[in-house]
């Protein structure tokens, strides 16, 4: 199928009669008919379909193309992970990483093709500063990460954990190892109370209020204390069962009916398009507005602004979908 031109697009999208007919037909179709084709392995942001569908009259991007829906409707990032971009990028209280302040590229790294970004993970991007060192006296014995059940099992088997830890540290002899375990259990109870209290603190403390804020404290630049799961995650009790700890939902693609290639924009500073330095809420969607795009993608800006710059035809061949 030949590549569609702007004239092809305008033959429908600039025709009020065609758009009205599309609106009426769309109201007769099931909602599932408009579901966007999923991209395997990618997390897509699915905005609610507008009441009139996508039938606004459009002549060209710079003039009457609507604002991006996620911004026009002030939609929120569904991720429940607590994260403050402004704090990480601008706060003087954030320890330097390799003798310099954090910047976008410390966490957001392009994939091999340069189009998308690699997944962000705790192990690769968080643990250097946000440790899981719950015991100040044994910083090499962290709480496990990624599974609430494993965390509870770890805390309820602390004597065995300390025994294994002591053996790895070279403590030999049954009596010496038993003494080590007893000493560690005594000091951790002095730090955080009984086993049940320690478990409550590990899961539900968010390091913001009261005595539960201090579970453990480690020294060293960039080695932060472990404040509790609730510092970063939504945590809910579960009737005596393992607490429910929310998993991050990190969106790969926001404007799923368009396309964007970061590699073609590598000369543009991140902050030109993304207001990360002013974002303090995890729910903020840090997409550029249409007006920011128009600065370049318009006749005045001199960069391509035809429809196919960002959009494919509605029903591409299967191999085209797979390649995007």
Residue ranges and their predicted role:
Residues 1-324:
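Short sequence/structural segments immediately N-terminal
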């Amino acid at each position: 199928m030949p590549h569609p031109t702007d004239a092809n697009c305008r033959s429908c999208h600039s025709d009020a009669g065609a758009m009205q007919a599309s609106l009426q037909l769309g109201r007769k179709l099931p909602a599932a008919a408009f579901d966007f084709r999923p991209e395997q392995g990618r997390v897509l942001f699915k905005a609610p379909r507008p009441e009139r569908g996508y039938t606004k009259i459009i002549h060209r991007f710079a003039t009457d193309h609507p604002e991006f829906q996620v911004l026009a409707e002030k939609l929120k990032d569904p991720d429940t992970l607590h994260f403050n971009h402004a704090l990480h990028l601008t706060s003087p209280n954030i320890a330097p990483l390799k003798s310099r302040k954090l910047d976008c590229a410390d966490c957001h790294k392009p994939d091999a093709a340069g189009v998308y970004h690699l997944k962000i993970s705790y192990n690769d991007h968080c643990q250097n500063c946000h440790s899981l060192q719950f015991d100040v006296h044994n910083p090499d014995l962290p709480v496990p990460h990624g599974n609430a059940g494993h965390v509870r099992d770890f805390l309820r088997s602390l004597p065995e954990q300390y025994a294994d830890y002591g053996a790895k540290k070279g403590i030999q002899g049954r009596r010496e190892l038993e003494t080590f375990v007893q000493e560690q259990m005594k000091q951790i109870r002095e730090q955080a109370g009984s086993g049940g209290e320690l478990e409550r603190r590990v899961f539900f403390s968010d390091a913001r209020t009261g005595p539960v804020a201090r579970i453990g404290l480690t020294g060293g630049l960039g080695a932060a204390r472990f404040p509790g799961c609730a510092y970063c995650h939504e945590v809910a009790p579960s009737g005596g069962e393992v607490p429910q700890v929310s998993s991050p939902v990190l969106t790969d693609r926001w404007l799923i009916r368009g396309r964007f290639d970061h590699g073609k924009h590598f000369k543009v500073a991140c902050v030109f398009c993304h207001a990360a330095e002013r974002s303090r809420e995890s729910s903020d969607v840090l997409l550029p507005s249409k007006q920011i795009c128009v600065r370049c993608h318009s006749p005045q800006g001199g960069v391509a602004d035809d429809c196919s710059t960002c959009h494919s035809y509605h029903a591409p061949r299967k191999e085209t979908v797979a390649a995007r």
